[in-house]
Regions:
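Domain-level signal for soluble alpha/beta catalytic cores
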Residues: 1-181
Length: 181
């Protein structure tokens, strides 16, 4: 099934759960870059994806949430290598279940102006690089998740629309002083 077809159905669509918590349970060390496991331990990543798909998730997020130049600084692998491996692992795990592989994109890890030093245009450029890598790797859709800055999400969405025709999902997290919504 194609992503566009999935979204035209009247049924509930289940997404996967947290990759980070599963990796921590598997022994991910503090300070490690979980996205590097796409290359160094693909079997672990595929196994986690397969568990979610077997449980009925129709959309599985690739292990690419932190794949940005800022967050991958010092990595032995390029952003493009990590995203390509992440999408490939996800697609292999999804195939037996007919689930879709989403390019999972999180915040860049830098604050945008005026609260930080990253210019809006530079954020659009960086998200464009991420989206192009996901498209080239064969992602079925894009999921922008856990954004707290509407301005940064706007940069991500503009980049996605400029560099892709894939369906897009987006989620935000807001604090209300008591809980995260």
């Amino acid at each position: 099934m194609q992503a566009n077809e999935l979204f035209t159905q009247p049924n509930t669509i289940l997404l996967d759960g947290g990759m980070g918590t599963m990796l921590q349970a598997a022994g991910l060390k503090l300070g490690a870059k979980p996205e590097e496991l796409n290359i160094t331990d693909p079997a672990l990543i595929e196994g986690i994806h397969a568990k979610y798909a077997a449980a009925g998730s129709r959309i599985i997020n690739a292990n690419t949430f932190g794949a940005s130049a800022h967050k991958l600084a010092g990595s032995a692998y390029t952003l493009e290598e990590i995203i390509a491996a992440g999408i490939a692992n996800c697609k292999r795990a999804c195939a037996p279940y007919g689930a879709l592989a989403a390019l999972d994109v999180g915040p860049l890890g830098e604050l945008l102006e005026p609260n930080g030093t990253l210019a809006f245009e530079d954020a659009v450029t960086e998200y464009g690089r991420i989206v192009r890598a996901g498209v080239a790797a064969g992602a079925d859709l894009i999921f922008f998740e856990t954004f707290t800055d509407l301005y940064e999400l706007k940069a991500a969405l503009l980049a996605a629309k400029e560099n892709s025709t894939l369906p897009i999902l987006a989620s935000m997290s807001f604090e209300d002083r008591k809980s995260v919504v």
